[in-house]
């Protein structure tokens, strides 16, 4: 929902395999983290099943508010052996993990956690991650729960502390009351963990809100957001911004901000010691003012197979770009700003091999899939909500501000369900409800969720919505992810329920 409420192809496929390759042969079918992998490509390594039938369901919220749902639910994960890891909001601000057999939906185990979501108008979700035979889960006090063997009904559980176990044990209450993880967890190919945290008060060792790294051997380090940005007014790692890694794992990307509706930077850091490689202050490509950073966004950096980095922000002045924001675009070390996309609000772009779109006649090896809503009732927008495939290396006039050059539209798809909330806007349709979309290169399609309560397959070969299944009656809600499991089951969240869909 809007804030106001060829050889080139061969190279691409090789590079994408490098990006999404697993840490062992057994990981190749897994959905490991937010947007699939540490580059947030959203590209499945398994062909999705047809959207024919709902196999099973799991509530992801046992304290659903009345009316619209201003909550970001954490992405489900799927192991290579088809265990589905579901973050569940158990109360008004309490969470747990529920693990299911991916085929039958049978519950295998539950894991409690003391994690509490940081305050934001759109409540942030809890974002676990998988590495090897370990599941990492956010806990309170900035701690991370480690559960061994998540495919088994029981597993050894331990804790990690980025600031040291002895420090925690010296004053547990001080850390539990003040330190909160505020992003999904990201693991690299060696099992090192990265995440943002808030320090909302004093601790014995003087923690300040920033970025944590826990090495595979359990040792931790951290750096404050103010220090990393070189700006004393920067107060946090951007809310819900999952850190991303370059294809070779050497560079870590994360955004920082001065708080809700403030300004911010995108950082490129040495992934081993968190030293700054580069930082860039994020600006609106039309006005050249500071871009608006919103705590209600779940946008995270996407890293392309060529190393280019994409990150979504809101416009400034707001909402002069019709609450669409911008998808900012940089080279690997952030030294060059490239063509922006015309939509960036609460969206993590997915990577699409150019060969999946037969109508494409350009030269880019890969394209981007993004939300492309056109919110009715906001500035000059008309309610013609779309999703889009964009060429990151070709430009055209922006559809809202023609004087600004943006990524060229390759194909777009208009929503299908009329929006009764906007009867005075001809052709207005319900929003696409997606913050990270699963791309299926085997069926050449993208799995997209809508606020009309339906899940769609967008066929990129014909530019049609070739399959649809009803999940709910439709509701306005904070944007949600889609996922493809290790047996091809499709997962989507609609009206606070996770549905498992397949043949």
Located regions from the model:
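Bacterial N-terminal signal peptides
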Residues: 11-22
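Bacterial N-terminal signal peptides that target proteins for export
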Residues: 1-12
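Extracytoplasmic/lumenal domain signature
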Residues: 27-34, 41-71, 80-86, 90-123, ...
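Basic/polar N-terminal segments that are highly enriched at the extreme N-terminus
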Residues: 2, 23-27
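Alpha-helical solenoid scaffolds in large eukaryotic transport, assembly, and signaling factors
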Residues: 74-75
């Amino acid at each position: 929902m809007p804030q106001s409420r060829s050889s080139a192809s061969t190279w691409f496929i090789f590079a994408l395999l490098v990006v999404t390759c697993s840490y062992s042969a057994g990981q190749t079918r897994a959905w490991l983290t937010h947007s699939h992998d540490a580059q947030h490509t959203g590209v499945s390594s398994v062909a999705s099943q047809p959207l024919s039938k709902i196999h099973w369901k799991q509530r992801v919220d046992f304290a659903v508010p009345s009316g619209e749902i201003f909550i970001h639910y954490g992405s489900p994960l799927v192991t290579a052996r088809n265990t589905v890891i579901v973050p569940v909001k158990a109360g008004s601000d309490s969470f747990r993990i529920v693990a299911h057999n991916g085929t039958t939906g049978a519950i295998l185990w539950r894991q409690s956690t003391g994690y509490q979501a940081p305050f934001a108008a759109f409540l942030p979700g809890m974002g676990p991650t998988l590495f090897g035979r370990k599941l990492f889960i956010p806990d309170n006090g900035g701690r991370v729960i480690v559960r061994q063997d998540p495919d088994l009904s029981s597993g050894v559980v331990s804790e990690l502390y980025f600031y040291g176990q002895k420090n925690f044990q010296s004053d547990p209450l001080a850390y539990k009351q003040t330190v909160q993880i505020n992003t999904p967890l990201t693991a690299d190919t060696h099992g090192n963990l990265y995440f943002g945290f808030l320090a909302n008060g004093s601790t014995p060792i003087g923690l300040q809100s920033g970025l944590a790294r826990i090495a595979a051997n359990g040792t931790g380090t951290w750096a404050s957001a103010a220090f990393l940005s070189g700006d004393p007014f920067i107060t946090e790692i951007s809310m819900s911004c999952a850190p991303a890694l370059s294809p070779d794992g050497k560079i870590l990307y994360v955004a920082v901000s001065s708080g809700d509706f403030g300004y911010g930077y995108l950082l490129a850091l040495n992934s081993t010691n968190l030293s700054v490689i580069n930082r860039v202050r994020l600006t609106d490509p039309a006005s050249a003012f500071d871009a608006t950073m919103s705590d209600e966004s779940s946008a995270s950096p996407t890293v392309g197979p060529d190393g280019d980095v994409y990150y979504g922000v809101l416009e400034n002045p707001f909402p002069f770009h019709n609450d669409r924001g911008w998808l900012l675009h940089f080279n690997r070390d952030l030294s060059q700003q490239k063509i922006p996309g015309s939509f960036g609000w609460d969206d993590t772009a997915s990577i699409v091999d150019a060969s999946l779109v037969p109508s494409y006649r350009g030269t880019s090896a890969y394209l981007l899939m993004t939300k492309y809503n056109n919110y009715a009732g906001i500035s000059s927008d008309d309610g013609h909500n779309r999703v889009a495939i964009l060429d990151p290396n070709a430009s055209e006039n922006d559809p809202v501000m023609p004087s600004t050059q943006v990524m060229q539209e390759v194909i777009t798809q208009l929503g299908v369900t009329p929006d009764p909330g906007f009867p005075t806007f001809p052709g207005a349709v319900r929003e696409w409800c997606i913050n990270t979309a699963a791309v299926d290169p085997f069926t050449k399609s993208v799995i997209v969720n809508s606020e009309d309560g339906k899940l769609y397959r967008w066929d990129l070969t014909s530019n049609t919505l070739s399959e649809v299944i009803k999940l709910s009656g439709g509701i306005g809600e904070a944007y949600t992810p889609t996922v493809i499991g290790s047996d091809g089951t499709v997962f989507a969240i609609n009206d606070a329920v996770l549905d498992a869909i397949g043949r």
